[in-house]
A protein has these predicted regions:
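Ribokinase/PfkB-type carbohydrate-kinase core domain
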Residues: 1-23, 84-100, 111-245, 303-307, ...
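Glycine-rich phosphate/adenosyl-contacting loop at the front of the ribokinase-like
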Residues: 1-70, 81-82
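Glycine/charged-rich beta-loop-alpha catalytic/anionic-binding loops adjacent to active sites
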Residues: 35-46, 91-94, 242-252
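Gly/Ala-rich phosphate-binding loop of Rossmann-like dinucleotide-binding domains
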Residues: 63, 166, 273
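Alpha-helical transmembrane segments within multi-pass membrane transporters and channels
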Residues: 74-76
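Conserved post-catalytic alpha-helical subdomain immediately downstream of the catalytic base
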Residues: 221-225, 230, 249-315
């Protein structure tokens, strides 16, 4: 399967991340102290805030890599403080970020991580009204975007945008992330009827296949492309049902794993933009993910397009 998009429409959330670090491991804590019904009290060794949200992270990655990118999202008034200019400086088209003047704050994501890359995430969508967003098909028509990515958001919003893209003939990635548990059998079947590519980590796709009452192989038969990430191990790539495993690119150091999955997606889309096949694109995705975890902020990593493409040579 070969696809070469010329401009990417990223539909997804914008958030300010609150990142907390527990020195040690969650597993060691659980082995030492009885954890009942998720009740735990942990010391925090580091706390900081940074730009985030899956939509913002992926758009940042694409813009940084030189891929023409349009962001379709909504935000509170605080988006104009620094976040908007930050994305524009990284070549992201923010003309279709709807700012709700009645909402002071954009979404918030609180992530508690340990020293081994494990995370507990809470997402607050904020009060900005998603109904203020432009229709995805109209954005594609106005901007020339010819491939979409639907990042994790409320099921009703994702389904609306999927319908708009499908009716306009724009292929897209369905990436429900932490929202997958809010879907049901019927909604997922409707989403899959649009023949999207499906991205998710092991847990997310386990939830998806459980809701659909199928296994991963059956999901791969229903979707032209399925990418199942496995953290530091790598990823499973299914293309028209055929499976291959792509080893992860090892990171030189681990500063923070937050947003590494979003960076991987940007790397995959970068590869497709440059006319690479899915295997090569997936390999580039692991390189970008590794670069991401070497930096503290999910929108702090950098790598040039030439440098990234050059990493394919020692891999082949």
């Amino acid at each position: 399967m070969q696809i070469r998009p010329t401009k990417i429409l990223v539909c997804g959330s914008l958030a300010v991340d609150h990142l907390l670090r527990h020195s040690g491991s969650f597993k060691a804590y659980q082995e030492t102290y009885e954890v009942e019904a998720m009740n735990a009290s942990l010391p925090i060794s580091d706390y900081r805030t940074c730009f985030g949200g899956c939509g913002g992270n992926i758009a940042y990655g694409l813009g940084t890599l030189g891929v023409p990118t349009v962001l379709l999202s909504h935000a509170g008034r605080d988006f104009g403080d620094r976040y908007e200019q930050h994305l524009i400086q990284h070549d992201v088209d923010c003309a279709f970020v709807a700012v709700d003047q009645n909402a002071e704050f954009s979404a918030r994501c609180t992530i508690l991580g340990d020293d081994f890359g494990n995370q507990i995430t809470g997402f607050y969508p904020g009060h900005a009204d998603p109904k203020l967003r432009s229709a995805a098909n109209r954005v594609c028509e106005q901007t020339g975007a010819d491939f979409g990515l639907l990042g994790p958001e409320a099921p009703e919003l994702m389904l609306k945008q999927a319908t708009e893209l499908h009716q306009f003939g724009v292929p897209f990635i369905f990436d429900p992330g932490q929202w997958i548990s809010e879907f049901n059998h019927s909604l997922l079947n409707t989403m899959l009827s649009f023949d999207p590519w499906v991205f998710g980590n092991e847990h997310e796709l386990d939830v998806m296949t459980t809701l659909l009452e199928i296994d991963i192989a059956a999901l791969a038969e229903r979707s032209p492309v399925v990418v199942r990430t496995q953290g530091a191990r790598g990823l499973d790539l299914y293309v028209e049902g055929a499976h291959q495993f792509i080893n992860a690119e090892p990171a030189k150091t681990i500063a923070d794993t937050t947003g590494s999955g979003d960076a991987l997606r940007a790397g995959v889309l970068f590869g497709l933009y440059h006319g690479l096949d899915l295997t090569q694109a997936a390999r580039l995705g692991t390189v970008v993910a590794a670069r991401s975890v070497e930096h503290m902020d999910p929108q702090g990593w950098t790598i040039s397009a030439d440098e990234l493409l050059a990493t394919l040579n020692p891999m082949n």
